[in-house]
Amino acid sequence: MSSDLAAELGFDPALKKKKKTKKVIPDDFDAAVNGKENGSGDDLFAGLKKKKKKSKSVSADAEAEKEPTDDIAEALGELSLKKKKKKTKDSSVDAFEKELAKAGLDNVDAESKEGTPSANSSIQQEVGLPYSELLSRFFNILRTNNPELAGDRSGPKFRIPPPVCLRDGKKTIFSNIQDIAEKLHRSPEHLIQYLFAELGTSGSVDGQKRLVIKGKFQSKQMENVLRRYILEYVTCKTCKSINTELKREQSNRLFFMVCKSCGSTRSVSSIKTGFQATVGKRRRM
């Protein structure tokens, strides 16, 4: 049936269709070839970004920022910090030696080695005295004016006789308390009152001016009490002198210690009685 229809229509199925060929104009062909080449070139550099040209506004901002910094630098002027150059030790030593030579200290050192001049006024006028000479002059003046502060043992020494304690049963006899009070330039009553307060006991003075104390005490204990008494009521705290006097004012009944060597005065605390235990039989209820 199909073959009959094809024969009637005049169509041969064995034959193929002929494709129509386009007529190419040479000018159009060249343009097309050039377009393909340009397109391929653009495709190669499509991944890369083109550099943008900096706008003039950016440069203007940079100039505006530079202007205030330049103004600040001009305002500071000479205050700009500069790095200090480190001077070498050799140059500093040479400069120091030159200054010594100008001052004439070399001659002074030579004179001090040979012998010290006798007059103090001439020494004071010179420049650059050595330390050893100044120190010796200071101690010489100190020994002449105040030998006690110089630590010189050749001056007047303060010595008191050691306390002599005797035993009499349960009592202790302080036999030389009168001599110690005279050495300290204090009244025996004041010294006895201090002893009773420190030892916490009581006693009395017999006909031979000996102190009879209730209780058993050794001479070492008496020495410690006497040391504390000397520091508190005899020695001057300003010049460490023992040439003092204890006075009592009638208006306020306070004790004042007056130093006869330096003239200083200070108040002294009054003697307070120590603790005394009451020993005795209790009453029966």
Curated annotation (Swiss-Prot):
InterPro entries: IF2/IF5, Transl_init_fac_IF2/IF5_dom, Transl_init_fac_IF2/IF5_N, Transl_init_fac_IF2/IF5_Zn-bd. GO terms for cellular component: cytosol; eukaryotic 43S preinitiation complex; eukaryotic translation initiation factor 2 complex; multi-eIF complex; ribosome. A zinc finger (C4-type) spans 236-262. The modification Phosphothreonine is found at T69, T116. Keywords: Cytoplasm, Initiation factor, Metal-binding, Phosphoprotein, Protein biosynthesis, Zinc, Zinc-finger. The modification Phosphoserine is found at S40, S80, S92, S112, S118. Residues 30-69 are annotated as: Disordered. SMART domains: eIF2B_5. One of its GO terms (molecular function) is translation initiation factor activity. It is found in: Cytoplasm, Cytosol. Its main location: cytoplasm. Eukaryotic translation initiation factor 2 eIF2 is a heterotrimeric complex composed of an alpha, a beta and a gamma subunit. The factors eIF-1, eIF-2, eIF-3, TIF5/eIF-5 and methionyl-tRNAi form a multifactor complex (MFC) that may bind to the 40S ribosome. Interacts with GCD6. Interacts with GCD1. Interacts with TIF5/eIF-5. Interacts with CDC123. This is Eukaryotic translation initiation factor 2 subunit beta. It comes from Saccharomyces cerevisiae (strain ATCC 204508 / S288c) (Baker's yeast).
